[in-house]
């Protein structure tokens, strides 16, 4: 307790507002901003492979990337999707997860263990469900962050649903798990508000183990790469201003109660759409130009990870770009596809043209 008080007074440890720099493999570039647009859609979110085709969620619809044809539509916005061996799992905002079988059978999962779904993945015959929070819906991620501040524990969890059998809790007290990827005998999960990736035991017998910590942004969904590595999307950047606000409980509570969420000093999927948005002095346009290194609440970032989950390559859309809010990535037939939810586009880049740093 005494150490915590001292850390708070001198601004160190959990109370430090420093943000790790983007250098080395995370050195900024314009690769997302210069990438080919594979499709334009309203707030494209979760990219997956289904029956060998790339499909994506957009609002209440699940669409094919190549043709734009609607695969399925729902009465609520889609929060997350996953597919394997003809099976399709869909999590809806403010509702539960439903599994659609190849034979036409439809299986809704228990609401108590599948509410607020943020990411899904199949593991053999089982389905892994990431629950972002017990208090908020999937589209209220900003509320969850502002409510928790820098708390060490959250209300998120990861639950395993066997095809036949009772659901099993793998991990709880997580800070907004937003991505999941089975890797061998473990499950790797992105924990957004903790800025890290953690490794979980599918049996829940071992405590979560960090595999990549102190990321410069808020990690989102994971996807396998063709070379056995992985892709990680980062949907928003960290900043010293936001880190400061997260530590000022009184200010943050008043901001949340009095100001619309779009105008909070908080991470965002897009920026510069309204004059009411908060802005730092370094983000003011000079001679009509916004510098790419200006402080921004939104950003576009995709990271390539090696087998040890170390960054080897990164793709960026910087402060002066528009392809921000990168919530999902998938690789198919030598091309990597990126969903820019804030930029309303899906981008495509040949893998062979991406040079690791």
What label would you give each PLM region?
Residues 91-98, 102-123, 130-156:
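Asp-box/WD-like beta-propeller blade repeats and closely related beta-sheet repeat scaffolds
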Residues 50-60, 89-95, 129-142, 188-194, ...:
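Conserved beta-strand positions in repeat-built beta-propeller and related beta-rich domains
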Residues 2-4, 11-43, 65-69, 304-318:
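A short helix->beta-strand "capping" segment at the edge of beta-propeller domains
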Residues 237, 325-357:
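Blade-level signature of beta-propeller repeat domains, shared across WD40, Kelch, NHL, RCC1
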Residues 32-39, 67-73, 105-111, 166-171, ...:
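A short beta-strand motif characteristic of beta-propeller blades
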Residues 130-152, 235-297:
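Short, conserved, GDST-rich strand-edge loop motifs in beta-rich repeat architectures
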Residues 65-68, 101-105, 161-165, 201-205, ...:
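Short loop/turn segments that connect beta-strands within beta-propeller blades
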Residues 39-51, 74-87, 112-125, 155-157, ...:
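Beta-rich, blade/repeat-based domains predominating
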């Amino acid at each position: 307790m005494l150490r915590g008080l001292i850390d708070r007074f001198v601004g160190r440890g959990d109370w430090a507002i420093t943000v790790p720099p983007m250098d080395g493999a995370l050195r900024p570039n314009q690769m997302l901003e210069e990438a080919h647009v594979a499709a334009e859609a309203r707030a494209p979110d979760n990219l997956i492979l289904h029956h060998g085709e790339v499909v994506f969620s957009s609002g209440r619809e699940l669409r094919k990337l190549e043709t734009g044809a609607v695969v399925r539509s729902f009465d609520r916005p889609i929060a997350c999707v996953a597919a394997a061996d003809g099976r399709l799992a869909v999590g809806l905002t403010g509702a539960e997860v439903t599994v659609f079988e190849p034979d036409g059978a439809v299986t809704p999962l228990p609401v108590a263990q599948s509410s607020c779904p943020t990411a899904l993945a199949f593991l053999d015959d089982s389905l892994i469900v990431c629950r972002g929070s017990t208090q908020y819906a999937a589209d209220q991620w900003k509320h969850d962050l502002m409510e928790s501040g820098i708390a060490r524990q959250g209300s998120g969890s990861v639950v395993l649903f066997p095809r036949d059998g009772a659901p099993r809790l793998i991990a709880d007290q997580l800070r907004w798990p937003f991505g999941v990827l089975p890797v061998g005998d473990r499950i790797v999960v992105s924990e957004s508000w903790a800025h890290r990736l953690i490794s979980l035991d599918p049996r829940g017998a071992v405590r979560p183990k960090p595999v990549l910590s102190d990321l410069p942004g808020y990690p989102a969904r994971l996807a396998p790469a063709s070379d056995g590595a992985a892709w990680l999307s980062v949907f928003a950047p960290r900043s010293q201003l936001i880190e400061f606000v997260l530590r000022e409980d009184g200010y943050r509570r008043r901001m949340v109660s009095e100001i619309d969420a779009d105008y909070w000093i908080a991470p965002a999927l897009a920026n510069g759409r309204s004059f009411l948005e908060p802005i730092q002095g370094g983000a003011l346009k000079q001679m009509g130009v916004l510098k790419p290194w200006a402080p921004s609440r939104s950003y576009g970032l995709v990271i390539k990870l090696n087998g040890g989950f170390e960054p080897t390559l990164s793709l960026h859309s910087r402060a002066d770009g528009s392809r921000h809010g990168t919530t999902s990535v998938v690789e198919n037939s030598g091309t990597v596809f990126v969903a820019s939810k804030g930029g309303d586009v899906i981008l495509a880049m040949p893998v062979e043209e991406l040079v690791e740093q």
